[in-house]
Amino acid sequence: MNKTTLLYTGKAKQVYATDDPDVLWMAYTNQATALNGEKKAQIAHKGELNRAISTLLFKELTAAGIPTHYLDSPDSTTMIVKKAAMLPLEVVVRNYASGHFVTKFNVKPMMKLDPPIHEYYYKSDELGDPFMNEAQIFALHEATPEQLKQVHALTDRINTYLTQRFAAIGITLVDFKLEYGTLKDGTLVLADELSPDNFRLVDQQTGASLDKDVFRQNRGPLTPVYEEVLSRLQEKGAAHV
């Protein structure tokens, strides 16, 4: 498998075409961003850590019956994935109140949200990733009712799995972001990445952040935080879920 043309450069990844038209080459970089890209820095080993965490979780979710784009990880910063037409939506799952949800609704931080909340945001840096409700999604033809039904069902299953997975290693999954795409046969798959860049994680004993909030809020070096998450996931495997 060889990469060919650079197709896309994102905030923390580069995506290349390959010599297989149905397969993409995803390269994780060391760049960290926050505040819609206004804050940027190069973080040592971040690409390797995000690739390792994403690979581990994609493999586990695939084994649990969740359709994903994951195929292989040939080196420390590369993931080989199925080519998918991405839905232009970010799916945010909130298990506990945090971030702007707290200020928007004037609720206590870390209040448990039961049932968990699903939110949809239009994926557009230019527009600031605005919130979208289902009616807007359908009216703008960004996804079909059947696709959104599948997204909701898969997201519930993924949330159940990940919540239990992190709880087993002493971490609370506060909220997180998912992205989906469709393969050429129409199959909806979980795509993008699964890492502390997109998760809000809190240590159950200390209350410390174990995610990109450490960088966003200048709380200290980010690399040891991601190393801690990976170490815990590796030490206690999926059999404990």
From Swiss-Prot:
Gene Ontology biological process terms, A to Z: 'de novo' IMP biosynthetic process; cobalamin biosynthetic process
Stored CDD domains: SAICAR_synt_PurC
EC number: 6.3.2.6
MF term (GO), any: phosphoribosylaminoimidazolesuccinocarboxamide synthase activity
Pathway the protein contributes to: Purine metabolism; IMP biosynthesis via de novo pathway; 5-amino-1-(5-phospho-D-ribosyl)imidazole-4-carboxamide from 5-amino-1-(5-phospho-D-ribosyl)imidazole-4-carboxylate: step 1/2
Catalytic reaction equation(s): 5-amino-1-(5-phospho-D-ribosyl)imidazole-4-carboxylate + L-aspartate + ATP = (2S)-2-[5-amino-1-(5-phospho-beta-D-ribosyl)imidazole-4-carboxamido]succinate + ADP + phosphate + 2 H(+)
Record keywords: ATP-binding, Ligase, Nucleotide-binding, Purine biosynthesis
Enzyme class: ligase
InterPro entries with a match to the protein in the record: SAICAR_synt/ADE2_N, SAICAR_synt_PurC, SAICAR_synth, SAICAR_synthetase
Top-level division of the source organism's lineage: Bacteria
Family of this protein: Belongs to the SAICAR synthetase family.
PANTHER family per the UniProt record, alphabetical: MULTIFUNCTIONAL PROTEIN ADE2, SI:DKEY-6E2.2
Protein name: Phosphoribosylaminoimidazole-succinocarboxamide synthase
Record lineage: Bacteria, Bacillati, Bacillota, Bacilli, Lactobacillales
Protein encoded by which gene: purC
